[in-house]
Amino acid sequence: MALCQRVTIFFSCAVAAGLLAAPAYAQDVSKLTSIVDWSLYTDSEKPHAFCFLTSTPKLSTPANAGSDGARVYISAWPKEGVKAEPSVRLGFATKKGSEITAAIGAQSFTLFADKERAYVADATSELKLVEAMRKGSKLAVTATDPSGTSVTDTYSLAGLGQAMQELQSTCF
C-alpha cells in the first residue's frame, strides 16, 4: 500500500480514536494501554490491519505558537510488513519551503511536510529515526509556521522502548 493511502487510513483511524478533531467512530480504534508517556491504539480487525503509538509534547515553544493538537506517532501496518513508521502531527501548516527537523540528542533528521503533518522521506531514515528515539530521552520537532515563527515541540521518549515491544507483540 502506498504511503499516502496508509497515512489516509491512519489519520481516519486517529480521528476515530479521538486523537484529532472530527466526528468519532470509536468502534474502529481502541486504546489498549499507556506506557509512561506513550499510548498504544489498535484497529478492531483480527489480525490487526494497523496499530500505533502516540504521545503529546511535554513542551512547546514559543508557548503561544499554535501547535494545538501536536502529536508524534509510530505506526505499524502488519499486512504491508511495516513495523515502525514515524510521523508527526504539527498542529499547524508549515511555511512553504521551510525545513522540519526532528532532533534526538546530537542526531538530526529532516522531515517533509504535507499540510499539518510531517514524515520521513525514506525507509532507511525511518529506521534510523525510530532507533534514535528508542535510545534517546527526548525528541524535539522544529518547524516554521506560516508567519515565519520557528516552533519547537519537545516530546518525552520515556517508555518508548517498552511501548515498541508492546506494539510489536500486539500487532505482529
Where does each model-flagged region fall?
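A generic "folded-domain core" signal
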Residues: 25-172
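Terminal low-complexity, poorly structured segments
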Residues: 15-16, 25
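N-terminal signal peptide c-region/cleavage motif recognized by signal peptidases
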Residues: 21-23
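Bacterial N-terminal signal peptides that target proteins for export
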Residues: 1-13
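Acidic/proline-rich low-complexity IDRs
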Residues: 2, 18-19, 159
